[in-house]
Amino acid sequence: MVGFKATDVPPTATVKFLGAGTAACIADLITFPLDTAKVRLQIQGESQGPVRATASAQYRGVMGTILTMVRTEGPRSLYNGLVAGLQRQMSFASVRIGLYDSVKQFYTKGSEHASIGSRLLAGSTTGALAVAVAQPTDVVKVRFQAQARAGGGRRYQSTVNAYKTIAREEGFRGLWKGTSPNVARNAIVNCAELVTYDLIKDALLKANLMTDDLPCHFTSAFGAGFCTTVIASPVDVVKTRYMNSALGQYSSAGHCALTMLQKEGPRAFYKGFMPSFLRLGSWNVVMFVTYEQLKRALMAACTSREAPF
């Protein structure tokens, strides 16, 4: 047995809720530079936007983007928007991941045997609900990641300043910009990520290929990360472009997608695929492994407090 030993008592909804948010924050701290590189690659080629990289900066590949940013803007630029990112994960992941099992049980009416349909419904529900809660934090995170420190200066000086500036210049709706593509993206991501993780893990356990331990969690999380990236990349690129667009640049998320297709071709929808996969794959591994261990650790702590002797 590697890691914390599973307890006889299943984790409570509160443990899952807190564990998911904490695990997601840990994963973000480790993989945030890859996410920033992904955003820069995704917005490259846009004609305009409220914040954008310097005109001379051309990003090529994951490492090329990271090295260019470090050279032109300094190492700290890789963590632009980290505060908003952590705020997002505590509210976002807690809902979409922490409530997944509870919603799945609701759709299966308490049955232990969940069908793929009920898992997909649960993933869509918690993914969409999480967006409703955390959208402003996502907008601020993307804006921070998109802006360059070199050149014309930074538009947003702090996380609080970003919230205030967006609300003042673009109205309250500015903080909820891109909600539609984000709902679509996260319904898709949640279904692909959580359902795939569930299915791979169940298959490995049923076939007795692995035990419910770290290697099983690692393998399931990595597979889920790849499947999710392939499925969600197009809507993720549209979401990022639309969130970072200037007021009036696109009339809707659909208009943004159509403009991308006309001006840049279908390959534009997979811009930043490699950093997306590296980020999502590594993020999934860190998050799911940490989440599984946190659930066991928290339940062990609760059990020991209730029965100290």
Swiss-Prot record:
It is found in: Mitochondrion inner membrane. The keyword Methyltransferase does not apply. The keyword Glycosyltransferase does not apply. Residues 41-77, 146-173, 243-268 are mitochondrial matrix. Inhibited by pyridoxal- 5'-phosphate, bathophenanthroline, tannic acid, bromocresol purple, butylmalonate and phenylsuccinate. Proton conductance is activated by cardiolipin and long-chain free fatty acids and inhibited by purine nucleotides ATP and ADP. Chloride ion transporter activity is inhibited by long-chain free fatty acids. GO terms for biological process: adaptive thermogenesis; C4-dicarboxylate transport; cellular response to amino acid starvation; cellular response to glucose stimulus; cellular response to insulin stimulus; cellular response to lead ion; glutamine metabolic process; glycolytic process. Keywords: Membrane, Mitochondrion, Mitochondrion inner membrane, Repeat, Transmembrane, Transmembrane helix, Transport. Residues 1-16, 104-119, 200-217, 295-309 are mitochondrial intermembrane. InterPro entries: Mit_carrier, Mito_Metabolite_Transporter, Mitochondrial_sb/sol_carrier, Mt_carrier_dom_sf. The record marks K141, R185 as: Important for inhibition by GDP. Widely expressed in adult human tissues, including tissues rich in macrophages. Most expressed in white adipose tissue and skeletal muscle. It comes from the Eukaryota. Disulfide bonds: none annotated. Changing A268G: Found in a patient with congenital hyperinsulinism; markedly decreases transporter activity. GO terms for molecular function: antiporter activity; chloride transmembrane transporter activity; GDP binding; L-aspartate transmembrane transporter activity; malate transmembrane transporter activity; oxaloacetate transmembrane transporter activity; oxidative phosphorylation uncoupler activity; phosphate ion uniporter activity. The chain crosses the membrane at residues 17-40, 78-103, 120-145, 174-199, 218-242, 269-294. Belongs to the mitochondrial carrier (TC 2.A.29) family. Homotetramer. Adopts an asymmetrical dimer of dimers functional form. This is Dicarboxylate carrier SLC25A8.
